[in-house]
């Protein structure tokens, strides 16, 4: 996120991730904090995907936003999905990656789960589905994309030379499936991690990991501290002794937690 309130926590988390999704507000565009965070990603060679959010609201033109991302964040982008309209006129997303259309039901603001395949964007059925004017505009936009933006390459994405762009509305869970389906397909597998003595590879059997942040007093009933650990290799098991390298002693963890947003559960 681009807001400065997220800054400190996000900087710490970037030491533990293998890939990143950069979220851009369609109305605000690139925010100051986004520029700083993207620079950290660039320094750490972390592959990035851009998600332009809140398409159900009025905002900047899609092409203007991609230009802004390229100029302010110094990224080389190519869209893998593209919006059909915006705000009140938002009709859905054309998935360039899979060549289909996902319609947005404007009145109820609900995602229509069924997608419509369009291998040929010149198919006259398109007018019946989204209307003549939006269909012609979409064809012109896709033609412009093909002429102006580079063809997507997974290798260039993984090396940080090219960043794919997706559009949608996270609040309405719209356009997110396209993003995540592609993410699963192209995102890198866990990378090796340099320790003080050697390079630790993820396929090694012995467990190794590192603490990337510590939170205190997360439970108001207790003066607790939680250490967040990135697993680098092996499999973690509770109640099994593990060596704390800095202290040089074994430690057991009887109630390790896994977090998903605000929800936590014992592993």
Where are these regions (language model features)?
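Structural and coupling elements of P-loop NTPases
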Residues: 1-267
């Amino acid at each position: 996120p681009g807001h400065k309130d997220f800054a400190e926590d996000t900087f710490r988390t970037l030491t533990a991730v293998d890939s990143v999704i950069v979220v851009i507000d369609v109305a605000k565009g690139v925010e100051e904090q986004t520029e700083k965070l993207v620079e950290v990603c660039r320094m750490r060679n972390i592959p990035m995907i851009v998600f332009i959010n809140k398409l159900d609201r009025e905002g900047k033109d899609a092409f203007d936003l991609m230009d802004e991302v390229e100029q302010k964040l110094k990224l080389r982008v190519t869209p893998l999905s593209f919006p059909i309209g915006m705000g009140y006129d938002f009709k859905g997303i054309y998935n360039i990656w899979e060549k289909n259309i996902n319609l947005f039901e404007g009145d109820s603001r609900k995602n229509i789960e069924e997608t419509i395949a369009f291998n040929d964007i010149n198919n006259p059925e398109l007018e019946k589905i989204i209307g003549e004017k939006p269909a012609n505009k979409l064809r012109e936009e896709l033609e412009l994309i093909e002429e102006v933006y580079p063809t997507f390459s997974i290798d260039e994405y993984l090396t940080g030379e090219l960043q794919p762009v997706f559009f949608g509305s996270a609040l309405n869970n719209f356009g997110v499936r396209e993003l995540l389906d592609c993410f699963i397909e192209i995102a890198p597998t866990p990378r090796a991690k340099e320790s003080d003595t050697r390079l630790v590879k993820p396929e090694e059997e012995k467990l190794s990991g590192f603490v990337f942040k510590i939170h205190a007093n997360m439970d108001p009933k207790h003066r607790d501290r939680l250490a967040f650990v990135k697993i680098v290799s092996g499999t973690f098991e509770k109640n099994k002794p593990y060596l704390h390298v800095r202290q040089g002693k074994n430690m057991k963890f009887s109630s390790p937690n896994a977090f998903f947003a605000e929800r936590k559960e014992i592993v």
